């Protein structure tokens, strides 16, 4: 962990769980998580909230943390009451990267045959929208984790970076690909080749971050956005998310073709009928997720 801490300025205040009620779980196992905290938030308890909670290690993303994160994501994905998910860290650090101690003794054979980091991208397969609420440092794997989310809200003191080059390696969980798509080749290349960090303000200007808020309100703002998303039809929201994500994987012609198919598909749903009827009748739609 010394190598990890050497990449960061000194974090004086200890991390602590915040904005949480007592842990609420609807998972198959009754055992408490070790590395994360979960809760349902929002007036209708329709937002799943996950906090990375490994403060002594600056929320370094060890294998156990990723396993627990995937379990929580799956549970919220299967919960019919939850329409969106917020992922956050601590007040000083979102996540400072992968766990260097776990990586230090790995060999090429270990990584290749074992599919090292292959389970990190389960977040990208979640159909419900995921909002990252980032305070403090989102570096290395922490930055990659934030970029796997659908929306990034940042605290005004947040910093983003891919400093793997400084410890003799490169990003391995999508950093070179997602960062380039988000901010463009020149800035991504500079960040990856120098290990330099960018501020929340620079990240927003570059298109990596959607909005910036004061440190103490960023999580609550993300929850409010998630509540707004969760008030819509879950099935149509999933279609919209799939269509936007296709823009990063397909040509324009292919993406427009998929969009058209998904658009047509909404006409097979009861929620499309309800939404249009509510608009014509000048009332609020009552979606049933059907």
Swiss-Prot record:
Transit peptide range is 1-27
The protein's location, in the record's own words, is: Mitochondrion matrix
Q: What Pfam families does the database record attribute to this sequence?
A: ECH_1
- Could you say which residues are annotated as the site Important for catalytic activity? 164
The main location is mitochondrion
Known catalytic reactions: a (3S)-3-hydroxyacyl-CoA = a (2E)-enoyl-CoA + H2O; a (3E)-enoyl-CoA = a 4-saturated (2E)-enoyl-CoA; (3E)-hexenoyl-CoA = (2E)-hexenoyl-CoA; (3S)-3-hydroxybutanoyl-CoA = (2E)-butenoyl-CoA + H2O
Q: Which UniProt keywords apply?
A: Acetylation, Fatty acid metabolism, Isomerase, Lipid metabolism, Lyase, Mitochondrion, Transit peptide
Amino-acid positions noted as binding substrate in the UniProt annotation, renumbered to this chain: 98-101, 141
Q: Which residues carry this modification: N6-acetyllysine?
A: 101, 211
Name the job this protein performs: Converts unsaturated trans-2-enoyl-CoA species ((2E)-enoyl-CoA) to the corresponding 3(S)-3-hydroxyacyl-CoA species through addition of a water molecule to the double bond. Catalyzes the hydration of medium- and short-chained fatty enoyl-CoA thioesters from 4 carbons long (C4) up to C16. Has high substrate specificity for crotonyl-CoA ((2E)-butenoyl-CoA) and moderate specificity for acryloyl-CoA, 3-methylcrotonyl-CoA (3-methyl-(2E)-butenoyl-CoA) and methacrylyl-CoA ((2E)-2-methylpropenoyl-CoA). Can bind tiglyl-CoA (2-methylcrotonoyl-CoA), but hydrates only a small amount of this substrate.
* Family classification: Belongs to the enoyl-CoA hydratase/isomerase family.
Listed under subunit, the entry gives:
Homohexamer; dimer of trimers.
Q: What is this protein called?
A: Enoyl-CoA hydratase, mitochondrial
Organism field: Bos taurus (Bovine)
Q: Which gene encodes it?
A: ECHS1
């Amino acid at each position: 962990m010394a190598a990890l801490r050497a990449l960061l300025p000194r974090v004086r205040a200890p991390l602590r769980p915040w904005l949480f009620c007592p842990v609420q779980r609807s998972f198959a196992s009754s055992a408490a998580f070790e590395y994360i905290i979960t809760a349902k938030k929002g007036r209708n308890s329709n937002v799943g909230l996950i906090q990375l909670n490994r403060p002594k290690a600056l929320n370094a993303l060890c294998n156990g943390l990723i396993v627990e994160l995937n379990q929580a994501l799956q549970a919220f994905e299967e919960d019919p009451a939850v329409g969106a998910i917020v992922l956050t860290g601590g007040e000083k650090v979102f996540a400072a990267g992968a766990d260097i101690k776990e990586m230090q003794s790995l060999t090429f054979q270990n990584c290749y045959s074992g599919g090292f980091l292959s389970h990190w991208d389960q977040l990208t397969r979640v159909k419900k929208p995921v909002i990252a609420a980032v305070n403090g440092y989102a570096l290395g794997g922490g930055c990659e984790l934030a970029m796997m989310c659908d929306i990034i809200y940042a605290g005004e003191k947040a910093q983003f970076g891919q400093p793997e080059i400084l410890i003799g390696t490169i990003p391995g969980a999508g950093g070179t690909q997602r960062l380039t798509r988000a901010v463009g080749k020149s800035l991504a290349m500079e960040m990856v080749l120098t290990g330099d960090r960018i501020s929340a303000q620079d990240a927003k200007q570059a298109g990596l971050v959607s909005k910036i808020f004061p440190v103490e309100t960023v999580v609550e703002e993300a929850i409010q956005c998630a509540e707004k998303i969760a008030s819509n039809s879950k099935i149509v929201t999933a279609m919209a998310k799939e269509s936007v994500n296709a823009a990063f994987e397909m040509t324009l012609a292919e993406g427009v073709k998929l969009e058209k198919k998904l658009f047509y598909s909404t006409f097979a749903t009861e929620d499309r009928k309800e939404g249009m009827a509510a608009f014509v009748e000048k009332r609020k739609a009552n979606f049933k997720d059907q």
